[in-house]
Amino acid sequence: DRRQRQMCIRDRRYISGNVLSGKQVSPNGFLGAFHSQLTVIPEGDDVHEMFGWIMPRFNQFSANHSYFSWLMGKKEYTLDARIKGGERHMIMSGEYDKVFPMDIMPEYLIKAIIAGDIDRMEALGIYEVAPEDFALCEFVCSSKMELQRIVRVGLDMLRAEMA
């Protein structure tokens, strides 16, 4: 029984805050100063898929219809902490626009931040955003980019420029 509990603890990811913008903590960790919830999700490291990239995946969630699960109608999915692939080149596909909560162009803003173009960042509305605004974009990002970190770097770059 104790061994099963230890395995259960190891197979879970503990997040201080919400799933999209929280920080990973240890099972004995604490909530962050600005967090009001503890989220626990499956780690997913116990799942091994042979040729997972080529399978049709009828039971996997996909925001951009990469898998055939969207043909099966609405259903609940069990999501885990796996990234399922590495970082890729940024593709301008409009996927951020579908989920971004504000009326700005998030893909162009991210490109301006990566390029370090402060004038373009200001023109595209960097003063109106926070890293947490890009949490859902990061979730649906087919390029697997850490968009919240990129936005934080851009805001820090602006702060350094103003000082």
What is the meaning of each model-derived region?
Residues 10-18:
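Short loop-to-beta-strand transition segments
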Residues 22-163:
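Gly/Ser/Thr/Ala-enriched C-terminal appendages of enzymes
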Residues 1-9:
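Single conserved hydrophobic/aromatic residue that forms the stacking wall/gate
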